[in-house]
Structure formats: C-alpha cells, structure tokens
Regions:
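N-terminal localization/anchoring segments of enzymes in phospholipid and broader phosphate metabolism
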Residues: 1-550, 568-572, 584-705
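Hydrophobic alpha/beta core scaffold segments
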Residues: 575-579
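Cofactor-pocket helix-loop regions in the catalytic cores of large enzyme subunits
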Residues: 555
Length: 705
C-alpha cells in the first residue's frame, strides 16, 4: 500500500535547510499506520497458522481503535482550533487527516477481504464456521428460543423522533439503526438498538464450532422488539470517540480528578463513524447528520464491524494444529532452586548477591524472577522496605498483593502508581485504594510528568549493613503481557545503582529534584543530553580511526534532536543499525545524510518491546537498557530510567540478541529511503524461534512443548 505523502524520493536536504528539511522526516501518524499494516501482513501471511492469522486481524482492529481515540483525536483537535502548525515532516493537520483517511480506507478493505475471502473459508474447512443465521443451517426455532431466553432481555430499543432526540452512543459500542413504518399508517420512524456485546459474547455458539455474530441474531428478530411496526431496513454502525484527556496537576485530589475525567471520556467528540457497507444511503446520511461528522470521518466497512472480537474465535478450545506451538517461559538458570525438593523456592537474594542477572521475557520467566523478588521480599523479616513503580499491571499479578502483605507485616511499602497511564487508569485507581487501606505509602508522581520508569527497590538489613536489591526493566510489571511482550529485566545489588534508584524514588515521593547521576540515565532532566553526548563521542571515535558503531533497539524513533544527531553520525561515516518496531520518523539511505543507517522492524509472534542502546566508542563500550523510547514525550514529559550494562557476559547476551534481530529474514521489514517498508522474504531465520531455542539451551532443555 502506498501513500503519496510518505513515499517520496530520497534526496538530500534543500540548500540552506540543513538537517531540519521536512523531506528528511517521515510523518509520525503515517508511520504508525505503516506499523499496523505490518500487523495486517501477518494476518495475510499463509505461512502463519490460521488461528494466529485471525488473532492478528483482531490486534489490527484494536490497534486502529486506539489510534483513532488518541492520535486522530489530537489531529482533529488541531483542525478545529484552526492550528496550521506542522510537524518536522511539514504536513499540515488538514492534509494529514486526509492522508490518514485515505490510508485507513485502503487498509480496511484489505482487512475485510482477508476475513471474508481467505480466513473464513479456511476456517470452515477446519470445522470452524463464522456465519450468519441464514447460512448456519440451524433451525429457525432454535434461534428463536435462544433469542427469547438469552438476548431479548438485555435489549433496549430507543426511539428517535419528535421529543426523542438521537441517543448518546458510547465509545466503540456496536449499534443497529432501524428504519420502521407504522403498520396502521404511513408514518416512518427510526430507532437505535445497542448490540450488548459488553454483557454477551459477540459470537454466539449455539452449536459447537459455529460462531454467529450477535448483531445478526438481533437483526433476524427485530420485529419482536417493535410489535405493530414494519421493519423497512436496518444498518450496523459503530462510533469511536476522543478518549484522550488531561488532568490538571494542580488538582487537590489527583485520584478524584482522574475518576472525573474517566467519566467525561465517555462523552468525547466523535472521531470516526463506521457504517456497514450495505447501509441504505438515507440511513447513512441521517447518521452523519445526527453525529455531526465530516466526510473524512466516515468509513464504510465491508462485512463485519469491529473485528477485535475475533479474538473470541481465535481462542476456541482445541485445534492445536491451527496454532503456533505453545511456549513456556523458562526459569533463568540463576533463579533455579539449589535444592530440588518439592516446593523448594530459590533464594533470589542469594542469586543477586552472586552476580548481576539479565532476564529476557517472554523467553525466560517473569513469575520466577520479578514476582519472586517481591514475594520473597514481602515474606523476609530482614527486609525493611519495598519500593515499586506501577505503570500497568494485571489482575493476576502477584506484585500488588505482595506489597499489601508487606505493608500488613509492618514493612515500608512504597508504590508509585501512575494514575494517568492511558486505558489503565481504573485498575490503577483500584490498586491505589487497596494499598492505601493497608497503610502502604502510595504516591502518584511528579506534577506535569507521567512516571514510566520500571523499577523495584528492596532494602534489606544484612548483619550490620543495609543492602539495596534493584530490578530495572524495559517493560511493565504485567504478568499476562510478560508472556507476550519481549522485554529485559536487570537485577543488581550494585551500591551505586541502588543509591541512584533510591534518589529517583525520593524525587517521586518528596521534594528532591531529579539530578544527573553517575550511572543511570533519568528523563526528563538527564537522558536526551547524555545520549546526544554518546552519539557525538561515537562520531569523534570514528573520525580518530577507532572502532565506532551505534546499535539501537526501541519501539519508536520520533525525537527530532536524536534523529538529527544520528544523521550527523551517518554523515561522519558511523555505521548505524536501528531496530524500531513501530513508528520511525528517520529516513534512512538518503544520499549525503543517512547512507550508513539501516532500519529494521520485527513484527511477529511476540511484541518487540525492549529498549537497548549500544555505542562503540573506540576501545570503550556504552550499553543501556530501560523504559524510554526516543520520543519527545519520553524524553521531556515522562520520568524514565535507563541503566548501564557493564558486565561483559551480559553485554554479549544483548549483542547476540541484536545480531539475531538484524539477521531475521522471516519476521523483519526494512525501511527504504522512500519511506516504504519492504518485508524480507524467503528466509529461514526467526529471532523469536532462535531466542526460544537459546532459552531452552540455557535451561538445559530442548523441548519446545
């Protein structure tokens, strides 16, 4: 798929414009759509098992929903405020909105076609049917009985007409607009019926292996909802609203302020209207009028709406042959019990005192490393304090319950809970209240900043000393995601790092101002500057004839200052390899600007999420892992933490991971100078397969089951 706005020839900067020339920058939003297209390509890939392809269709939809709720809402807000301010790529908000709409329409068509023409027939051959009532072969009286007993009681038809205005449509809800005629006359009217997929399964399984869309069952029984009327026609539609919001840092009660904004989020401005492609033109026009949306906000969708619910089908019991071979994260060798008796648990403190440890998720286990650290700390009578940052966590995580146990046992339990973690606010509010009820110290960070750092600090009394046990990660302490997201966790008892992390917690809980530390890098005050210095030192090493190289792995590369620094390094001749899973605004391969830069994106079985920054500075090496991407929001508006990896064996492990990422030729796309992402095809190397094998070897096993 091509966009004229992003697929421009690779040329050097215009005279006088230098490295700020808009032609040197790819648009942030269009680059994100490129990433979601890569997800869609996996759904289209016949080499993927069919239920995995269905899962990727679901992920594509969920991703796109969030993109509209946050990013498109932001563009729309700029248009409505008549802002003509352009980003580094020079695209105005109005032109960007048109480009987004055109790109999404093309992706939507591919998305719908993949389900209807490819995956549905393939699944049917395997005994899994996604069909409407009419095609199911199930007797009508069976449907009638199911509708009356299970669906009808949950429905609430809402009339639209004089004295009955068009009802409020909640964000991402699925609805039927029904056109009616009074059987006793010529009066025509409309009504809205919400599809109650929040309380009922989206796909009804009256017979095993047959999935019938809930909205189709409702549509087949509309006359039961409107006795005495004739149903002329109906149309399915879905609304997406602005779900982004800001909370004043001056609020007296931040928790209450976030709760208030969450209630207001339901009433955000409409940013997208999706309508079933078979809709009557008159009904479509009424929806556009009632919802007050612009033409480029209306999307006609072929087939089913809201394919995020396909996850229900993808998770059907059985059918192992239609899925990837399951993977069980391995316990890191350092965290295995020394004694193998039943129920024996490793002494994680002893393991950390022995050496620094680098754990790679999901190849290695989150539960036997991160969760075990907090659980053991909560139970250990010599532990004085446990301090944790929580950005996102899961209901089944042992982290917060362990903190509650620690507080109840009289330990100092400190939890920095980020209430403004988007779409995790409600859960974080709940955790905050539960922790406060048992006497834990709960704080919500620094005014004006989100706390995105991922760290745990355990303070333990040992003989006559106090020792710091520190874990610093690249991803959230989220048990479920740790089985799907690729991340690193670094465990250390370094006195220096322990003190610096303690300083960070003091800045989060008190009035201490974050400062530049000798070892760790912290945003917003001391991260961009040190990283730019490292790039400059790499340039100096190269010019001096010493070995020099930059290798960076991240989720997104957006920050203009960092991009310009990488361009300068490339102009000096420094080899640069970038592994950027999602958004990349840097344009590689531009003559005279970025000829030595290669950009690769890995999208596959696991979500690449770790951040690894490596600099060869002549005889020196600098290597960091942590929570920050190279984006303005991370470097300027968040509390972030990057930790140096100094042990050679751990650096070698990170180097090996990067080598495998750049060598992948099955899950990898390479960014071209004109902005296209080109998939590497016909290869045999998969970084995910290779790292699973590496983890098994380290664990002393060879069994992928």
């Amino acid at each position: 798929m091509e966009s004229a706005l992003s697929r421009t020839p690779a040329t050097g900067p215009k005279a006088g414009s230098g490295l700020r020339d808009p032609a040197l920058y790819l648009n942030r939003e269009l680059s994100w759509l490129d990433f979601n297209e890569r997800v869609l390509e996996l759904a289209e890939d016949p080499a993927q098992p069919v239920l995995e392809r269905l899962k990727f269709l679901s992920i594509f939809t969920s991703n796109l929903d969030e993109f509209f709720m946050v990013r498109v809402a932001g563009v729309q807000e700029k248009i409505e405020s008549r802002s003509d301010r352009c980003g580094p790529d020079g695209l105005s908000p109005t032109h960007l909105m048109d480009a987004i709409a055109a790109t999404v329409r093309a992706l939507d068509r591919r998305h719908a076609r993949q389900l209807s023409e490819v995956l549905t027939p393939t699944l049917s051959h395997a005994g899994i049917r996604i069909v409407g009532c009419a095609q199911s072969g199930i007797p009508a009286d069976t449907f009638e009985r199911y509708f009356r007993e299970h669906i009808f009681p949950t429905l609430t038809p809402l009339a639209i007409g004089p004295g009955r205005p068009f009802p409020y449509i909640s964000n991402l809800s699925l609805s039927l607009l029904v056109h009616l005629r009074d059987r006793g006359g010529d009066a025509e009217m409309y009504a809205r019926v919400k599809v109650p997929k929040e309380v009922l399964p989206r796909f009804v399984t009256i017979e095993p292996g047959t999935f019938i869309p809930l909205e189709d069952l409702i549509a087949h029984h509309l006359e039961a909802l409107f006795p005495g009327t004739e149903v002329i026609s109906h149309s399915l539609f879905r609304v997406t609203r602005d779900a982004d919001f800001e909370v004043s840092d001056e609020a007296d009660d931040l928790l209450a302020a976030v709760e208030s904004e969450l209630r207001r989020r339901r009433f955000g401005e409409v940013v997208r209207l999706e309508v079933g492609s078979g809709a009557d033109p008159g009904m479509r026009a009424r929806l556009v009028e009632w919802l007050d949306v612009a033409p480029n906000q209306v999307f006609d969708v072929d087939g089913l709406l809201d394919l995020s619910d396909l996850r229900q089908v993808a998770e059907i019991d059985g059918h192992a042959e239609l899925r990837q071979q399951p993977w069980t994260p391995q316990t890191h060798p350092a965290f295995r019990p020394l004694v193998t008796e039943a129920g024996e648990q490793p002494d994680i403190f002893a393991a950390m005192r022995e050496s620094e440890i680098l754990v790679h998720y999901p190849y290695q286990s989150f539960s036997s490393s991160v969760e075990r650290l907090v659980l053991q700390a909560a139970e250990d009578p010599d532990v004085l304090a446990i301090k944790v940052t929580v950005y996102r966590t899961s209901d089944d995580s042992a982290l917060v319950p362990a903190l509650i146990s620690a507080a109840e046992a009289g330990k100092q339990a400190v939890c920095m809970v980020e209430l403004k973690a988007r779409f995790s606010e409600r859960q974080n509010i709940r955790w905050s209240r539960e922790l406060e009820e048992v006497g834990a110290h709960v704080v919500h960070g620094v005014p004006g900043l989100k706390t995105h750092a991922k760290t745990i600090l355990v303070v333990r009394r040992e003989h006559k000393e106090v020792r710091h046990y520190v874990m610093i990660g690249t991803g959230n302490f989220h048990a479920k995601n740790a089985r799907l997201y690729e991340d690193f966790g670094f465990f250390t008892t370094s006195r220096e790092i322990g003190q610096e992390v303690n300083n960070l917690f003091n800045s989060l809980t008190g009035y201490a101002h974050p400062q530049r530390e000798p070892k760790v890098l912290t945003a917003p005050d001391a991260m961009r500057g040190p990283l730019l210095e490292l790039i400059d030192r790499t340039i100096a090493a190269h010019r001096a004839g010493a070995p020099a190289r930059i290798r960076l792995k991240m989720n997104a590369l957006v920050d203009p200052a960092c991009i310009r620094a990488l361009y300068r390094a490339s102009q000096a001749g420094v080899p640069i390899e970038l592994n950027v899973r999602g958004i990349c605004c840097l344009r590689p391969g531009v003559p005279g600007v970025s000829e030595t830069i290669t950009v690769v994106s890995i999208v596959g079985r696991f979500l690449e999420h770790s951040r690894v920054f490596s600099f060869q500075l002549g005889a020196e090496r600098a290597m960091y892992i942590g929570s920050a991407d190279l984006m303005p929001r991370n470097l300027d508006a968040r509390v972030e933490l990057m930790v140096p990896i100094e042990r050679e064996d751990l650096r070698a492990e990170l180097d090996d991971t990067l080598d495998r990422c750049f060598a992948d030729d099955t899950n990898a796309w390479t960014l071209q100078p004109d902005g296209r992402w080109e998939r590497r095809r016909g290869g045999t190397r998969s970084v995910h397969d290779e790292l699973m094998a590496r983890a098994l070897t380290a664990a002393g096993s060879t069994d992928l089951d």
